[in-house]
Amino acid sequence: MKKNTLMAMIMAICLSVASLAMAADTIPVGVPIPMTGWAAGSGADYFKGIKMAIDELNETGGVLGKQLEIFRFDSKGFEPEVVMQAADYLCGQKKVAAVFAGWAGWGQDVTAYGKYDAPFFADDGSQAAVDVFRTDPEKYYNIYQMTPTGPGQAISMFRALTNLPYKYPNKKLVIINTDDSWGLEIKDTIAKNFKKIGWKVAKQETVPYGTNEWGIILSRVRRIKPALIHFEIASGQENITFIQQFLKKPTNTIVSIGWGITPREVVDNLGTTADGIIGEMPAGLPAPKAPNAAGQAWVDKFVSLYKHQIPAGSWIFYTAVKAWAHAAEQVGDAFDFKAVNKYLQENGYEGHQGLMKWDKDNVMRAQPASPVVHYQVQKGELSPIFTDPPLTPYPHGKFIKPRWIK
């Protein structure tokens, strides 16, 4: 009996030691992205880039000789309590070395992950998130925004829309946006800049996420006959239904849907029906024809893996993983968070399009190595027409007047 008990104890100790040894051979990383709910489509787009980068690293020896292990958490609709639960689970319990979150909120994520020191990479695109960071930069030093804020993206949209090789029939603008900080920031910036050049905001509608019946708004739009509609809702389904209903009785109007053009579900659902629609992808790699050989190799591999062109978030979060891995390798310890964060802030990362760096707010503003890419849907796919900064016509694409404009 004693022998059996002793043997059981020895086996338990051996299993525990083996488990610890296995754990020591991996580096955990957190991926809190929406897997259910209204943001699940864009969450899947982010995950494709994250997984592609992690698979590449693991196939070539991992980071510092250790394989990366992904721990996921469903961040759903970024409710503050869910975001806090994710941070406590990933950083508090799983002790991850880094977190790759994609769109993660509009400031609640900064508060949640700022309690810890592991580098946290987000795509909030929100001035509200930056404002939280600015309340205590030393505390939130581990928070990295991978794209420009809403106002920065809206300025780029304004530049693109006012430089189309197209003569607007009038100077009437309609803006439709969501009621979150993202939608309001875009609306305010677009309206202010168009008013400066003599345009009139003929109608502005703020709506909640989940709005899919556009009949009343569109009936008013058809009476106004605006030269331009800017529609800004960072969720695929609302963009799909708006375009479908607009095209039932279109006006001679350029339709811009901003960030909403780039979730993969939008072009997958609409196909060639969306031809002529304009939008933008912040922090993008132009495709299907990339600007250089390194970028083209990446595009070709992505398309080979996922059987479609690049959606929003995939390339920039592939890059976030590679930037963190490079910093960890240079420091020599993925868990020396102070040193890894210092390396990222001081050195940035050499990506497919050049050196990318964060500013004093840890925001990756629009820059040549991480440009805003402006697209038009053509033949059911995204075709780049401008990159910014500086705003430049893309050499492998051109604007085509939408078929519904007579």
Model-assigned labels for residue ranges:
Residues 246-318, 329-331, 388-405:
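Extracellular/periplasmic periplasmic-binding protein-like sensory domains
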